[in-house]
């Protein structure tokens, strides 16, 4: 089975080896058809702690690492300018 992958932006790097990644999806409203942006935050395991706030990263679903951590950071796609 292929693991799920998502692309998002790091919004918090305050924890050791852990990053909060915000992933935005654009969905159409069921009744009205208006396009809505929905953002979900994932807790991801960053082994080397290389990512910083604002970086665009790819995360992949994995086995549970802790109570809320089921994703690992695979790669940094784009570094933030700050």
Curated annotation (Swiss-Prot):
Q: Tell me if Methyltransferase is a UniProt keyword of this record.
A: no
Stored Pfam families:
Ribosomal_S17
Q: What InterPro entries is this protein classified in?
A: NA-bd_OB-fold (IPR012340), Ribosomal_uS17 (IPR000266), Ribosomal_uS17_bact/chlr (IPR019984), Ribosomal_uS17_CS (IPR019979)
GO process terms (BP): translation
Superkingdom, according to UniProt?
Eukaryota
Tell me, what is one Gene Ontology molecular-function annotation carried by this entry?
structural constituent of ribosome
Location comes to: Plastid, Chloroplast
A cellular-component GO term for this protein: chloroplast
Keywords in alphabetical order, please. Answer: Chloroplast, Plastid, Ribonucleoprotein, Ribosomal protein, RNA-binding, rRNA-binding
Coarse class of the protein's main subcellular location:
plastid
Oligomeric state and interaction partners are given as: Part of the 30S ribosomal subunit.
The role this protein plays is: One of the primary rRNA binding proteins, it binds specifically to the 5'-end of 16S ribosomal RNA.
Family recorded in the similarity comment: Belongs to the universal ribosomal protein uS17 family.
Q: What is this protein called?
A: Small ribosomal subunit protein uS17c
What organism does the UniProt record list as the source? Emiliania huxleyi
**Underlying gene:** rps17
């Amino acid at each position: 089975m292929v693991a799920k992958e998502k692309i998002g932006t790091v919004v918090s790097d305050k924890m050791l080896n852990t990053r909060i990644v915000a992933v935005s999806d654009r969905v159409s409203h069921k009744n009205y058809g208006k396009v809505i942006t929905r953002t979900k935050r994932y807790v991801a395991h960053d082994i080397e702690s290389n990512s910083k706030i604002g970086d665009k990263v790819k995360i992949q679903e994995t086995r549970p690492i802790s109570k809320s951590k089921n994703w690992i950071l695979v790669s940094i796609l784009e570094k933030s300018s700050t």
